[in-house]
Each structure stands twice: as structure tokens, then as C-alpha cells.
Curated annotation (Swiss-Prot):
Subunit note: Heterohexamer of two PFD-alpha type and four PFD-beta type subunits.
Assigned protein family: Belongs to the prefoldin subunit beta family.
Transmembrane regions: none
Entry keyword set: Chaperone
A cellular-component GO term for this protein: cytosol
UniProt-recorded name of the protein: Probable prefoldin subunit 1
Classification lineage: Eukaryota, Fungi, Dikarya, Ascomycota, Taphrinomycotina
GO BP term, example: protein folding
One annotated GO molecular function: unfolded protein binding
Length: 112
């Protein structure tokens, strides 16, 4: 019984640690998505005849406005997919942690 309780407790602690990591990752992805959305919004105001430059390491390279917009769209779609996958992981670990806590509570009640 003691061994089972320690395994459940380890699972709960592991899930809580994973939750914290996932929450940080979600926040970072949401921040990057917000930056991409703002960049796209700014590019909407830019005329087709204006020069657009993209970062290439420490340099900037002149790019086609359409390709920059396409790149931003692809980046935003990828970020949204990543956020969705992380949210699924978050839900899984929240459920796992909750179930582990419930099992620990039942074990404590059965011992008492």
C-alpha cells in the first residue's frame, strides 16, 4: 500500500512539473503569435510599392511583400497548431494530477 501511494505521489508531482513547463511554453507561443499578428497588421498598411526587409541573422534582405505575408501566415498557423497541441497536453496533465490527488485521498481514507 505504501509503495502504491508513493508511485501515485510521484505521478502527481511529475504531472504538476509538466504542467508548469507546458504553461510557460504556451505563454511563449502566444507571445510569438501576438508579435506575428501585429507584424501582419502593420504590413497591411504598407503599399505594394514599398520596400520590405526580412531579418537574416545580423543582416536584412529585401523581400517581396507577398512572400513576407505568406511566411507570416505560415508561421501563425504553425504557432496556432503548437498552442493547440500544448493545450491538449495541459488538459491531460491536469486530469492526471487531479486523478492522482483523488487516489491519494482515497488511500489516506482507507488507512484511517
Amino acid at each position: 500500500m505504501q509503495n502504491l501511494a508513493s508511485q501515485i505521489q510521484e505521478k502527481a508531482v511529475d504531472s504538476q512539473q509538466q504542467l508548469r513547463t507546458i504553461m510557460v511554453q504556451i505563454a511563449a507561443k502566444e507571445r510569438a503569435l501576438k508579435i506575428s499578428e501585429l507584424a501582419k497588421k502593420e504590413l497591411e498598411d504598407v503599399g505594394e510599392d514599398k520596400a520590405v526587409y526580412t531579418s537574416l541573422g545580423k543582416m536584412f534582405m529585401k523581400s517581396d511583400l507577398a512572400s513576407v505575408r505568406t511566411h507570416l501566415d505560415a508561421e501563425m498557423a504553425s504557432l496556432r497548431e503548437d498552442i493547440e497541441a500544448l493545450q491538449k497536453k495541459q488538459t491531460y496533465h491536469e486530469t492526471t494530477a487531479s486523478n492522482a490527488e483523488q487516489h491519494l485521498q482515497k488511500i489516506k481514507e482507507s488507512i484511517s
